[in-house]
Amino acid sequence: MSQALPLITRQGDRIAIVRGLRTPFARQATVFHGVPAVDLGKMVVGEMLARSDIPADVIEQLVFGQVVQMPEAPNIAREIVLGTGMSVHTDAYSVSRACATSFQAVANVAESLMAGTIRAGIAGGADSSSVLPIGVSKTLARTLVDANKARTLSQKLKLFSRLRPRDLLPVPPAVAEYSTGLRMGDTAEQMAKSWGITREQQDALAHRSHQLAAKAWEEGKLSAEVMTAYAPPFREPLEQDNNIRKNSTLADYQKLRPAFDRKHGTVTAANSTPLTDGAAAVILMTESRAKELGLTPLGYLRSYAFTAIDVWQDMLLGPAWSTPLALERAGLTLADLTLIDMHEAFAAQTLANLQCLASERFAREVLGRSQATGEVDESKFNVLGGSIAYGHPFAATGARMITQTLHELRRRGGGFGLVTACAAGGLGAAMIVEAE
């Protein structure tokens, strides 16, 4: 094992995560229908600052992300600063790393803390699958640009006369990889076939996810980290995630047909994460700054790793690649972890990554490592359920996982936790967090 790389500032401070909060996550076109991601981001950051009693001018930087970009607000981070009463002098910029976007936001703020350019910052992400950038055809787009440059009415009419009815149809956002044309579900089907994952195994994991998430809510474990949200017309509050099946039964999953490979597939809407709206954020500080303000951190960022692999085959193996690297940088092994939280984009993807982590052959032949990362202990794995149950607002999931894991570590008396996710483009992310 190579030498661990401690995440500390120039003054020797650890990177503290002092607060974390999220909105409830809502299925597409339900409670947050019509609420753009920027407003969800303002909602969660404003509430988090109000709850924390941290003066607004203490926050020197805000790094935020969204995956489904809205052209009218390309820098969501700056709009959140301007819309939440924070100091106008707060530095703010936006990031995007597909489903690992808020992992990237956290890493960026941590790097600013380590460089000494700031002492406190906010990281997070928001996405709306209900407010989408509906585009136009390439032909219509080109015609509109040319018409804007035309000098006479006759020139404009001539340009528009070339359009056909099909050119006027709206173009929804692409759901496939730009480079391959494959949908995420197609990749999940690939992985199920590559790793011999059955429909029964996928349905069982999805059922477990919903059961554990429902239990977590029932026992009140999530109430401190999820705000009550109101959406227009502001009559009914949303207090909990509305995707969780509180009375999940395994038989219900077996009724659904495959969603991607209709004839031979095993990936269904029930064993996949749904399109979701929501936002999540965390406040990071140097350890000494937290002490100055009298704040007790939720925990500390011990290490992180980002990886990238080919997109043509099994591209959602990011956790299997990034986890050993994050563990190595933290000076830990899988056995040292108290909790493991893996993003459940699809049950097939999750199960494939678990197989790879335990595989000696994968370690040797693919990763070039002498031994497997290790077999994941189910009693440590996604103990409060995962994204299949909670939902997945793309840019918000990482911040949800970090906050949720730190709270659960504290309930268990401390320890180390792994949070890890796959992402579009063959990307992977993993972070080791620590609570005392």
Curated annotation (Swiss-Prot):
Q: Where is the active site?
A: C99, H392, C422
Q: Which Gene3D superfamilies match?
A: 3.40.47.10
What Pfam family does this protein match (any one)? Answer: Thiolase_N
Q: What class of enzyme is it?
A: transferase
Localized where?
Answer: Cytoplasm
Instruction: Note the InterPro entries from the entry.
Output: Ac-CoA_C-AcTrfase_FadI, Thiolase, Thiolase-like, Thiolase_acyl_enz_int_AS, Thiolase_AS, Thiolase_C, Thiolase_CS, Thiolase_N
Which molecular-function annotations from GO does this UniProt entry contain?
A: acetyl-CoA C-acyltransferase activity
Note whether Cell membrane occurs among the keywords.
no
Q: Quick one: which pathway? A: Lipid metabolism; fatty acid beta-oxidation
The catalytic activity of this protein is classed by the Enzyme Commission as 2.3.1.16
Q: Name one GO cellular component term.
A: cytosol
Q: What biological-process terms (Gene Ontology) are attached?
A: fatty acid beta-oxidation
Protein origin, superkingdom: Bacteria
Which family is annotated?
Belongs to the thiolase-like superfamily. Thiolase family.
Q: What is the annotated quaternary arrangement, including any partners?
A: Heterotetramer of two alpha chains (FadJ) and two beta chains (FadI).
Q: What does this protein do?
A: Catalyzes the final step of fatty acid oxidation in which acetyl-CoA is released and the CoA ester of a fatty acid two carbons shorter is formed.
PANTHER family hit by this protein: ACETYL-COA ACETYLTRANSFERASE, CYTOSOLIC, ACETYL-COA C-ACYLTRANSFERASE
Q: What is this protein called?
A: 3-ketoacyl-CoA thiolase
Species, as recorded = Klebsiella pneumoniae (strain 342)
